[in-house]
């Protein structure tokens, strides 16, 4: 059991946080967040962080570790997560990684590729092309060269679009080829529990309800406070988090409140679609439909079965 690591993964708004907190009442888990949005301080409402009450009863590692103007990579996540896993196991507990940043899960479990270092000349060329043709043009180019990577990143994620094209221009190989190649993998047994709502309409409705709740709780005011405290720019990695970009553009007068709301909900649904695409191809994952009554009981029973079998063996 010393090398067992449980991973609770799923799309946004599928019920991961509530389930993770419940699991802590049944098993000696310690939670590690796998969420590229929750790492940021002062970004609480829009990232759907666990409540203060939830964090008191179920502490999460890797939440509130970066300022909104800082960046954080998959490589940094792997270093932090592996260090935490080792410490948790040493204490006699079991790591439970919870989140929806599938690129982090993928990097952790399959190892990181040795990618070429950034090349200023190539980056400058891509930035000039973006200025003249637009980032949509570069995203379409990436879709033709590396459709697998393009399907996994947002069309407005300029940093990742640039990096994927940079890798291709430097090596002649696609980023997806690098990421799926053989890499050194950590010495853990990962148990992947995937929340996978079968009805998209159910998930879409939850996403809309949650976005409206965020707006009611002060999401717009949260973004205004970020602008007052930090030199916030729309191209920061933190502002790629769904909802934040749309509210920034609303505050800048680019569109009205209702358009902002519609765009925020649409962006969140697109995120969920990308997360489900990752999950659909995740080999060996145990799938649970989180819209079904009693799905949490099924997961608890499966975890207990796995732990019992591990101890008996």
Curated annotation (Swiss-Prot):
GO terms for molecular function: ATP binding; tRNA dimethylallyltransferase activity. The keyword Magnesium applies. Its cofactor is Mg(2+). Catalyzes the transfer of a dimethylallyl group onto the adenine at position 37 in tRNAs that read codons beginning with uridine, leading to the formation of N6-(dimethylallyl)adenosine (i(6)A). Its EC number is 2.5.1.75. It comes from Legionella pneumophila (strain Lens). Monomer. It is an enzyme of class 2 (transferase). Transmembrane segments: none annotated. It comes from the Bacteria. ATP binds at residues 10-17. The keyword NAD does not apply. This is tRNA dimethylallyltransferase.
């Amino acid at each position: 059991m010393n090398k067992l690591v449980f991973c609770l993964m799923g799309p946004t708004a599928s019920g991961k946080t509530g389930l993770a907190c419940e699991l802590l009442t049944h098993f000696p888990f310690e939670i590690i967040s796998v969420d590229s949005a929750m790492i940021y301080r002062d970004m609480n409402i829009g990232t759907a962080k666990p409540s203060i009450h939830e964090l008191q009863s179920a502490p999460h590692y890797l939440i509130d570790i970066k300022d909104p103007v800082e960046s954080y990579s998959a490589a940094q996540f792997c270093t932090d997560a592996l260090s935490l896993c080792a410490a948790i196991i040493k204490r006699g507990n079991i790591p439970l990684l919870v989140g929806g940043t599938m690129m982090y899960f993928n990097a952790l479990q399959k190892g990181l590729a040795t990618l070429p270092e950034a090349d200023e000349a190539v980056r400058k060329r891509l930035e000039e092309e973006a200025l003249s043709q637009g980032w949509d043009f570069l995203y379409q180019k990436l879709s033709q060269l590396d459709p697998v990577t393009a399907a996994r990143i947002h069309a407005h994620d300029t940093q990742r679009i640039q990096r994927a094209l940079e890798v291709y221009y430097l090596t002649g190989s696609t980023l997806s080829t690098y990421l799926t190649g053989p890499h050194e993998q950590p010495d853990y047994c990962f148990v992947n529990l995937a929340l996978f709502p079968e009805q998209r309409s159910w998930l879409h409705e939850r996403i809309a309800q949650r976005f409206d709740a965020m707006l009611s709780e002060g999401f717009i005011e949260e973004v205004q406070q970020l602008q007052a405290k930090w030199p916030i720019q729309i191209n920061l990695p933190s502002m790629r988090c769904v909802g934040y970009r749309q509210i920034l553009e609303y505050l800048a007068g680019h569109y009205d409140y209702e358009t902002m709301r519609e765009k925020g909900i649409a962006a969140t649904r697109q995120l969920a679609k990308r997360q489900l695409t990752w999950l659909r191809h995740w080999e060996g994952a145990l799938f649970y439909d989180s819209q079904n009554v009693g799905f949490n009981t099924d997961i608890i029973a499966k975890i207990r079965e796995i732990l019992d079998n591990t101890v008996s063996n």
